[in-house]
């Protein structure tokens, strides 16, 4: 069967990277059953032949109007699809969609009529914001990192920047590779407009956002970048829990030590692009 990836090496490389990352998510235990979602802007890889492709499934409503997404193309994980299956067969467990001219609906164009994730409105709202701000970020990743979700069950870590402070203090690399810390979104019903709006607000100042008692959403230049930032923060959470399991609250790096790292590496205080 012909695929939209045939003869399009750059697009195939993006899809291959997505498949690689979904394998990591499964291996880490972050993607039970059909848990987690991925959306990547692939518009720049669409040639005239792709743009002329007709819909292969009925038009679906997004549930909101997203004016910056008119005519844009995204690879999306399918609803009910497993990350471990996507790692092997990305175009059977996800699809490429085109946003319609009304900016409020979409259609699947390739390869199979796989309906995107139920959390598509949240993902597309984030993509709309990234385009609105001129960001070079293309990918959104939702997953269930065990240690970070566990910490979200403790109220202390949901107040202010306490979780960011603790995670940064565990190992210098967390501060270096996740310099915007982690945003916190109080519990909201999955796939709800409330959750989408709260996530969008936190993404304005963070590359990774923690949904209380649920999971994380990360944005990045590509899907590997979004994964790496989540992975770095989860490693810090793991270190914290290992130290706690030895019977004491870990000391962590001091404020002075963390500032020294920030100054030495000239770490950004806002999204670099």
Regions found by a protein language model. Give the residues of each.
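Glycine-rich flexible loops
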Residues: 1-273
């Amino acid at each position: 069967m012909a695929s939209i990836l045939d003869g399009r090496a750059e697009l195939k490389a993006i899809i291959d990277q997505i498949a690689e990352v979904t394998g990591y998510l499964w291996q880490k235990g972050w993607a039970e059953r059909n848990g987690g979602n991925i959306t990547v802007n692939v518009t720049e890889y669409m040639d005239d032949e792709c743009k002329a492709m007709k819909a292969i499934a009925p038009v679906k409503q997004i549930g909101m109007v997203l004016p910056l997404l008119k005519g844009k193309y995204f690879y999306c994980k399918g609803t009910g699809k497993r990350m471990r299956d996507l790692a092997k067969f990305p175009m059977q467990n996800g699809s490429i969609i085109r946003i319609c001219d009304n900016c409020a609906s979409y259609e699947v164009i390739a390869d199979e009529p796989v309906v995107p994730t139920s959390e598509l409105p949240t993902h597309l709202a984030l993509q709309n914001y990234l385009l609105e701000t001129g960001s070079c970020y293309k990918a959104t990743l939702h997953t269930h990192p065990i240690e970070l979700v566990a910490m979200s069950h403790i109220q202390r870590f949901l107040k202010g920047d306490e979780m960011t402070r603790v995670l940064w203090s565990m190992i210098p690399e967390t501060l270096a590779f996740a310099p915007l810390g982690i945003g916190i979104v109080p519990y909201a019903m999955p796939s709800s407009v409330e959750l989408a709006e709260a996530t969008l607000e936190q993404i304005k100042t963070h590359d990774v956002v923690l949904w209380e008692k649920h999971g994380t959403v990360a944005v990045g230049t590509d899907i590997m970048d979004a994964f790496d930032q989540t992975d770095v923060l989860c490693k810090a959470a793991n270190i914290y829990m290992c130290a706690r399991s030895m019977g004491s609250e870990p000391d962590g790096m001091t404020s002075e030590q963390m500032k020294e790292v920030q100054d030495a590496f000239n770490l950004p205080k806002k999204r670099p692009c």
